[in-house]
């Protein structure tokens, strides 16, 4: 067998002519190159249909011819082998194109497409932050924090225990949520958030989730477990039984509103007892009688220390603590008033307007971090704290986010209308199932800037949400307008006319219910607590009889929530909770 060594052109002139034609040569040029007659080449073109051959088929025949020439070449160079490999890959690619033209399946063109949906694919880590995301979070954190918040950050780097007394609404919970997420990502330490109630603890969770979304990370789970290092973000109410088993950095908010704080502190402090962990306590002030005040003042540290050398004296005045101070008991303390926050870059307040909206005493308590002496209050904090419960954990029959949160069980509504621009208060009260049982405040609302019709409409919506059995409304003065509108859709509504005698009856009823521990509301509802604490016993203008009044402030709003609660409680007789000895009944037949 004779093997050709001519690799330039095939010996079949008819095939050579076709390949040259597809390269762009004309019929006369091809005839001259092959030394053939022009009519012969023209005849081949017409008979073989060179023009009708698809472009991909032309390339395939050209590849085949060239590859065949290289394969039968006896002595191949390195360049020949490279070209053979290249041509082989091109033939494979053309084969995929042909399959795609028949099936329309993109996977025939690109094999990687078929691998995209394979089960063996590695799943992305849950709650995972890339290095770039963490860097961006840090940048956002420092750019969006006020100066006084960055002071808290620096203190946290140096001190194990931070104790902060603060004004309302200066962004402490917001800030510490962000700080804790970054600390968990960097250190791997668990972050524990302990609040007055589980509902309040979830405020931390909402802020953390929103912070993570700024870098396109969706955090899920309760607790949230970070995919980077396994650190947990744990959100707890004040149930010490659930708190004691955890370990990590601790954040406790609103400590001056937590009932039985000393019991909780003993358990909670153990969660951050290791030297590399830290504890942060922060709160607005409540009353000097609160359990947390000795912890703040240093009195708790001195208990059991008889020696004068062991005892400490801590100046907890604003002058001493405005800039933050490491005190002798090892705690770093700071007081941040609303004026301090303004100096620290928080320009969200109009202080002069707040002073106009609040009495001098109320402004000092709400915004200047001064404690209230509740000795003159009809309802001292010591009594009210027995009413505070973690409703999310203890009220299993109440679903706050359902269309009908309390099902078909009856509720009572108490309403204190808006007077002269202050807010209107409304409570939804669940009466006890049995005589002498507990009342529960399911909902409370404070509405400001509403006219009579809007106030009445707000009550009407509550009647659609609950099985309302009773509505009590203060119909004194301007309140009569709301009462008349409510009676149009709820004819059984009761109008309550304020007199010294009526106020006394309401206060005595509420006092009895609270004294017996028969009122419950969520521990995070500090506005209810403040509202009751604002009520004082005074004399009427004539000086002939005693009555009950409250300071008028934007926050306590003349104790509207307390009065609204008492309007609802009035549906039960004053003697209903008084236990009476069992008596026998005699039935006579005549």
Swiss-Prot record:
Nucleotide-binding among keywords: yes
Region (Disordered): 105-125
Keyword Nucleotide-binding annotated: yes
Disulfide bonds: none
Gene Ontology MF terms in the entry: ATP binding
UniProt superkingdom: Viruses
Keywords carried by this UniProt record: ATP-binding, Nucleotide-binding, Viral genome packaging, Viral release from host cell
Function, as annotated: P protein is probably the ATPase subunit of the terminase which directs cos cleavage. The Q, P and M proteins are needed to package DNA into proheads and for the conversion of proheads to capsids.
Family under the similarity heading: To phage HP1 protein ORF16.
Protein name as annotated: Terminase, ATPase subunit
Species this protein is from: Escherichia phage P2 (Bacteriophage P2)
Lineage of the organism: Viruses, Duplodnaviria, Heunggongvirae, Uroviricota, Caudoviricetes
Gene: P
């Amino acid at each position: 067998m004779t093997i050709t060594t001519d690799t330039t052109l095939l010996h079949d002139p008819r095939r050579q002519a076709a390949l040259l034609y597809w390269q762009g040569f004309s019929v006369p040029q091809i005839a001259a190159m092959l030394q053939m007659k022009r009519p012969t080449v023209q005849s081949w073109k017409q008979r073989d249909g060179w023009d009708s051959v698809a472009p991909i088929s032309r390339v395939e025949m050209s590849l085949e011819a060239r590859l065949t020439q290289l394969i039968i070449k006896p002595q191949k160079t390195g360049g020949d082998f490279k070209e053979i490999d290249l041509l082989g890959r091109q033939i494979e690619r053309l084969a995929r194109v042909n399959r795609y033209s028949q099936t329309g399946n993109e996977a025939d063109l690109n094999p990687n497409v078929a691998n995209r949906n394979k089960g063996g694919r590695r799943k992305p880590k849950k709650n995972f932050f890339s290095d770039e995301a963490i860097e961006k979070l840090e940048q956002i954190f420092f750019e969006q924090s006020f100066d006084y918040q960055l002071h808290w950050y620096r203190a946290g780097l140096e001190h194990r225990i931070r104790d902060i007394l603060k004004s309302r609404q200066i962004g402490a919970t917001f800030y510490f949520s962000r700080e804790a997420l970054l600390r968990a990502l960097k250190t791997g330490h668990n972050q524990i958030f302990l609040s007055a109630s589980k509902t309040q603890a979830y405020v931390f969770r909402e802020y953390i989730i929103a912070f993570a979304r700024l870098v396109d990370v969706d955090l899920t789970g309760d607790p949230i477990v970070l995919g980077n290092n396994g650190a947990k973000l744990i959100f707890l109410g004040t149930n010490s039984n659930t708190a004691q088993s955890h370990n990590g950095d601790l954040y406790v908010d609103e400590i001056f509103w937590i009932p039985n704080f000393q019991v909780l502190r003993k358990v909670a402090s153990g969660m951050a007892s290791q030297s590399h962990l830290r504890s942060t306590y922060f709160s607005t002030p409540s009353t000097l009688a609160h359990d947390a005040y000795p912890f703040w003042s240093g009195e708790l540290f001195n208990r059991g220390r008889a020696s004068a050398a062991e005892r400490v004296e801590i100046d907890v005045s604003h002058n001493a603590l405005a800039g933050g101070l490491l005190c002798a008991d090892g705690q770093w303390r700071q007081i941040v008033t609303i004026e301090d926050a303004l100096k620290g870059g928080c320009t969200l307040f109009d202080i002069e307007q707040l002073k106009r909206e609040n009495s001098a005493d109320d402004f000092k308590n709400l915004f200047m971090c001064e404690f209230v002496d509740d000795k003159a209050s009809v309802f001292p904090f010591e009594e009210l704290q027995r009413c505070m419960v973690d409703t999310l954990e203890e009220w299993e029959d109440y679903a706050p986010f359902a269309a009908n949160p309390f099902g078909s069980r009856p509720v009572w509504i108490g309403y204190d209308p808006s007077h002269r621009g202050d807010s209107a208060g409304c409570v939804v009260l669940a009466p006890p199932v049995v005589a002498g049982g507990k009342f529960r405040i399911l909902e409370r609302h404070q509405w400001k800037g509403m006219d009579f019709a809007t106030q009445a409409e707000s009550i009407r919506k509550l009647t659609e949400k609950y099985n309302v059995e009773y509505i009590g409304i203060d119909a004194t003065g301007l309140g009569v307008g709301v009462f008349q509108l409510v009676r149009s859709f709820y004819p059984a509504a009761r109008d309550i006319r304020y007199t010294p005698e009526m106020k006394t009856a309401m206060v005595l009823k509420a006092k009895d219910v609270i004294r017996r521990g028969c009122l419950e509301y969520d521990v995070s509802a500090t506005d209810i607590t403040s509202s009751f604490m604002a009520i004082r016993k005074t004399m009427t203008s004539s000086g002939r009889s005693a009555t009950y009044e409250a300071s008028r402030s934007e926050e306590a709003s003349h104790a509207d929530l307390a009065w609204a609660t008492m309007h609802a409680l009035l549906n039960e007789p004053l003697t209903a909770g008084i236990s009476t000895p069992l008596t026998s009944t005699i039935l006579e037949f005549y």
